[in-house]
Amino acid sequence: LLVTPATLCDAPSMQDFLSSDNRTQTAKHDYCTQPVNLAGLPAATVPVKLSSRSLPLCIQIIGRYGREDEVLSLAKFIENNVQFPRMQLI
């Protein structure tokens, strides 16, 4: 298993997101996840911390082809041990 950041930063504000074209936003925010998706590898994203703006920061767990069970097992372990706060949905 390989653990990487899921993104390079927390989520942009709507104004920041709309200030760049889709290709630029994709390059910035999908940098870590896109290659894994294109390779067809199993992966899961798990929140582990809140940013200074109280937005989730996540890690990505990448597994071997066909071993979703390993990815989900580690994701569950991290989820149970990190105790990430539940967010209030508006």
Please identify what each model-predicted range represents.
Residues 38-90:
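Structural helix-boundary/capping segments
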